[in-house]
Amino acid sequence: MKVLVIGSGGREHALAWKSSQDDAVTKVFVCPGNAGTALEEKLENISLDLNNFEEIADFCKNENIALVIIGPEQPLVMGMTDFLQAKDISTFGPSEAAAQLEGSKTFSKDFFVKYGIPTAGYAAFDSFDEALMHLDQIEFPTVVKADGLAAGKGVIICNTKNEAVNALESIFKDQTFGEAGSSVVIEDFLEGEEASFIAVVSKDKIIPLATSQDHKAVGEGDIGLNTGGMGAYSPAPIVDENIHQKIIDEVMTPTMHGLISEGSPYLGFLYAGLMIKDGEIKVLEFNCRFGDPETQPILLRLKSSLVELCLAAINDELESHEIEWTEKHSCGVVIASQGYPESYESNKLVSLPNNTESETKLFHAGTKLSNNEVLTSGGRVFCATALGDNLKEAQAKAYNLVDKVSFEGAFFRKDIGFKGIK
């Protein structure tokens, strides 16, 4: 069978790589893919207009694609799943309506309140002046969020009123996030430890994936600007059995049932970004796709077929489906371009290791091939990922792989995983 993965990041390299491991899969097309997917066995990059759903559907029909996995959020929010499913193409990803959980912070916060899902207190504004007046009524620190999709960078933690004013000016007046910043959510700052809970969902059925913890801030010690994520590890020790069950009971189940009540039953990866403190959980955000970089360490631990899992969800057969994980730990460290998450230079020549040790994988993100050479083409360039008998060993192997990759302006956080090492 043939699979099509939509996207070009580290997440999509991991999804395509994992799909290719299924013996039944003969070819995985990646659109548009990156240098990593171009170099993998059984993978092939293709160039299609991702805004032209008809062109994608025609390709799927002509190539007899058995499964489409949509990686990034933008095509989901634009309704790619709806279009392809209407053409009888097996597509794994939520509908346009269900993807509003990620597409609009205001929609998601209102949804949380309506269905009793624990979250931080908030207020939403589509006017700079009203948002500014609200700052006089709240305590600091606070969190200012652009309402729409901002590639994981639209969340600004403000320690003072002055910082919050600057954030609002950046969003409303400078239009830093474009249309995504036409309205904002201002919410209470939550303390605690973050965790990522990602599950495969089909209507009211759920298979939780391995837990993980992301590192959003650009700098060591979680300081600096928010990014799409600078590294992740799995499992996350903070999610013990009690917390795990609590997340399913208080977050995932009411979300699934709420979406059914709204007429938008969910299909796809559903990712809850959580804050955990003293055994209590609150939802920071929902993402309607696999996290990046969480995908890379999580899929390194998955022993079962990803393709069979996705097809079981599409065919409403999750209830009888089981998946298997390695007991080993994994750690993924992002290597980024100097200047990320703000402006950075591209087209830097990359030096890669000739071989890597067992149980390690270098996933490409912002890379491209030019005359058989690998060049940088994005802010996050690689995710060096490794398995180990414990997190400390996985971390050491991941950083050992990081040291073998070089390009001008490369940087990475040196503390990925330390929170999970006791």
Please give the residue ranges for each predicted region.
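Active-site nucleotide/adenylate-binding loops and adjacent lid/helix of ATP-dependent enzymes
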Residues: L4-V5, L101-S183, Q213, P237, ...
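Active-site "cap" helix and flanking loop/linker of ATP-utilizing ligase/carboxylase catalytic domains
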Residues: I248-L270, N287-E359, S370
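Short, charged, surface-exposed secondary-structure boundary motifs
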Residues: L39-E41, E55-A57, Q100-T106, G219-E220
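Solvent-exposed alpha-helices and their adjacent loops that cap or buttress functional pockets
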Residues: Q21, A38-L39, F92, K114-G116, ...
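ATP-binding N-terminal substructure of ATP-dependent carboxylate-amine bond-forming enzymes
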Residues: M1-E96
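Generic C-terminus detector
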Residues: T367-N371, L375-K422
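Internal nucleotide-binding/catalytic subdomain
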Residues: C158-T295
